[in-house]
């Protein structure tokens, strides 16, 4: 929980409100006694906190009786499916997408559009994104939801704690502040304060989605220490240590795509040579597989289309494509081996485009990890990382953005519900 308000009575109350809301959001529906037990407060101490969250519309009574008797209506508590919603947006090289997620974690609205954003001026891109944002906010308003914040996923370096894209090579952007271009989308028409805006690297938001939504469908839940790899045109990574993103001094940690795999390899747009993206990026794999990237993009527009083409060709036994994917897995394994040796994660999670190509990438990737990491010195490999494929796939960054936008409500319910509910201090 974010530290709020110091140790004053007001600050303690705000922290406890957050603890109650977060506990019910993560584990509910729960009875009041169960909430008290989980956060270590007395029932009498929890009661006014619950009442305040009920008045604010952040919690609701389910009407389901608690165990051990008939109970009373609303005896169990759940987070509301109305009220605040997190708005997530994604700016991709070939698409734009927006979604809204409620406190229960359900996607309540989603729109996407093909968009040729590569080397496009930021202004028109943000104008199109603003139109999609207006569409989503209008849709959720009809369901009793209001935006609590906006988070935007971008494929590039983002200044830590700022809204400026420092460099996004695959978009062709440098030093672009998204706040002015999205001002119309973040300023509510009723004159209330502008929505909080977060801009974040897409791989970091993919990792956040993995923390919140990963596992399930027969997969183990992600550990608290893992490396999340996300790829489409470019390749990014996010490092999670003890459940928190490792951002680096400037917020640039995780630029896996520009780790040199073969120092004398082909030139990269970043100015280096032999970068991972030159072997495992989408365009590199298309080229190595005998599919001209430009023609493939024209014939198969839209997010995921070229990845689908590669997967189909590989499944049909196209030798050149299978070989290209094998090379991509080898290069990815070499790059990840350094990260694994340095960080000792419990898992490596493949997301984005890599998830759809995993059957052909994993064998060579895992071989390189076994050869090049300290795991090879452990005969039982008991402590080594496992490599898993995210079930979220290419949806991870967008979902992570929406959940990031909603986090402010969970961290500080008192402030977040202030426009609709102004409790006494």
Outline where the language-model segments fall.
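ATP-binding/phosphotransfer module of carbohydrate and carboxylate kinases, centering on a glycine-rich
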Residues: 1-74, 78-112, 118-146, 187, ...
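Phosphate-binding/catalytic loop of phosphoryl-transfer enzymes
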Residues: 89, 146-153, 157-284, 400, ...
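A short, sequence-level motif marking secondary-structure junctions
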Residues: 115-116, 252
């Amino acid at each position: 929980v974010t530290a709020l308000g110091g140790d004053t009575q007001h600050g303690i109350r705000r922290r406890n409100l957050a603890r109650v809301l977060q506990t019910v959001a993560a584990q509910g529906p729960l009875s009041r006694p169960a909430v008290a037990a989980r956060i270590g407060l007395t029932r009498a101490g929890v009661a006014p906190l619950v009442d305040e969250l009920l008045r604010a519309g952040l919690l609701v009574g389910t009407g389901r009786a608690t165990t051990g008797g008939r109970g009373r209506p609303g005896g169990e508590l759940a987070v509301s499916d109305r009220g605040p919603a997190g708005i997530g947006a994604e700016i991709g090289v070939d698409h734009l997408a927006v979604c809204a997620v409620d406190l229960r974690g359900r996607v309540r609205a989603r729109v996407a559009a093909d968009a040729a954003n590569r080397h496009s001026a930021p202004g028109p891109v943000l104008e199109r994104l603003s139109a999609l944002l207006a569409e989503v906010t209008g849709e959720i308003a009809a369901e009793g939801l209001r935006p609590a914040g906006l988070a935007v996923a971008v494929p590039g370096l983002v200044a830590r704690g700022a809204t400026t894209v420092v460099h996004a090579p695959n978009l062709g952007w440098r030093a672009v502040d998204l706040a002015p271009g999205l001002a119309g989308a973040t300023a509510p028409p009723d004159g209330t304060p502008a929505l909080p805006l977060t801009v974040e690297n897409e791989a970091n938001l993919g990792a956040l989605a993995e923390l919140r939504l990963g596992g399930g469908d027969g997969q183990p839940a992600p550990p608290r220490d893992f490396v999340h790899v996300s790829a489409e045109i470019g390749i990014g990574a996010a490092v999670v240590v003890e459940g928190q993103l490792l951002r680096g001094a400037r917020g640039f940690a995780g630029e896996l795509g520009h780790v040199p795999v073969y120092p004398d390899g082909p030139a990269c747009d970043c100015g280096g040579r032999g970068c991972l993206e030159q072997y495992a990026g989408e365009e590199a794999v298309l080229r190595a597989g005998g599919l001209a990237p430009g023609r493939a993009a024209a014939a198969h527009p839209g997010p995921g289309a070229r990845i689908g083409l590669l997967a189909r060709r590989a499944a049909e036994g196209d030798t050149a494509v299978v070989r290209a994917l094998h090379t991509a897995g080898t290069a990815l394994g070499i790059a990840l081996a350094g990260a694994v040796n340095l960080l000792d994660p419990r898992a490596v999670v493949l997301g984005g485009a890599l998830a759809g190509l995993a059957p052909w990438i994993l064998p060579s990737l895992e071989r390189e990890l076994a050869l090049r990491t300290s795991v090879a010195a452990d005969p039982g490999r008991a402590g080594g990382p496992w490599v898993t494929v995210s079930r979220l796939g290419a949806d991870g960054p967008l979902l992570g953005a929406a959940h990031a936008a909603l986090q402010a409500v969970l961290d500080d319910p008192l402030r977040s519900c202030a426009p609709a509910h102004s409790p006494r201090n």
